Amino acid sequence: METTARQVASSGVIGPTLSDPLAEALRLVALANGRGLQVRLMGGLAFHARTPDWTAMVDRKRRDIDLATRGKDRKALSDLMVAEGYTADRQYNALYGHKQLYFIDEARQRPVDVLVDRLEMCHRFEFADRLTVAEVTLPPAELLLSKLQVVKINRKDVLDALALLSEYPLANGDEAGEAISVRRITSLTSSDWGWWRTITDNLDNLRTIVEGDLQPGELEFGRASRFQPSAQIAALREAIDGTPKSTKWKIRARVGDRMTWYQEPEEVGHGRG
């Protein structure tokens, strides 16, 4: 993955967008990096970049581009996107640009969503200070969190999470962006009961599927996976359970499921006007 990014960065590719969504996403990240902007890939294409053997075997489609950046780079990134031929949704960006930007490649009808500083869906996590951990994508811990924060998790999200756990080790730190930081995950689950509730429930869902409900070819790499996902799930759950909880966590735990512990993601349309 890093070699690919460096090749794109040094190729000097400019002009029309590329037909392959992942190649185009890597091109945009490289161009942004060349201007001193902190921009990283997230969403489905980040999993293509991180687990290429798996996505190739399961024929996972590539289309939308999802990027992450920090607030201070928002304006410069917007200028870059327009210069590269993308159309900005001016109305949407004026209303929501402090947290999310939207562009589209009109010729290819390919959208680009840019999250600013944080992901806010069922749960929220900040990533502005994590953008330099890995070279191309958000760190593996954040990619895993982006799946495990989904309360009504679907099979695609489950398989994405399992693929990541099959290919990257658990570690206390980030290991230069090549490991899933347990410390990053437990920092959320030990301080926020809602995060704990959703993540532990989803880890249980992952374990159930990987231990008896996987369909042929769903988690196929064309080779042995680097790690056993069931062991990774068990180790992560043990770390979560073993991390001391904050006073705020303990107070919220007394309420439990009697109060909703997550947010319903808001759907907002795009007009590009």
Residue ranges and their predicted role:
Residues M1-Q38, T51-K61, R110, V116, ...:
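The feature captures the alpha-helical scaffold/lid subdomain characteristic of nucleotidyltransferase
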Residues M1-Q7, D73, L77-A88:
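Short N-terminal secondary-structure initiator segments
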Residues L18-L26, D66-K72, L95-Y96, Y102, ...:
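Short low-complexity stretches enriched in small and charged residues
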Residues M42, T69, L138:
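A conserved hydrophobic position in a structured secondary element of the catalytic/binding core
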Residues G44-H48:
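Short glycine-enriched loops at secondary-structure junctions
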Residues P52-L77, M81, A161:
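Catalytic metal-binding acidic patch
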Residues S78, V82-H123:
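Conserved catalytic core of two-metal-ion nucleotidyltransferases
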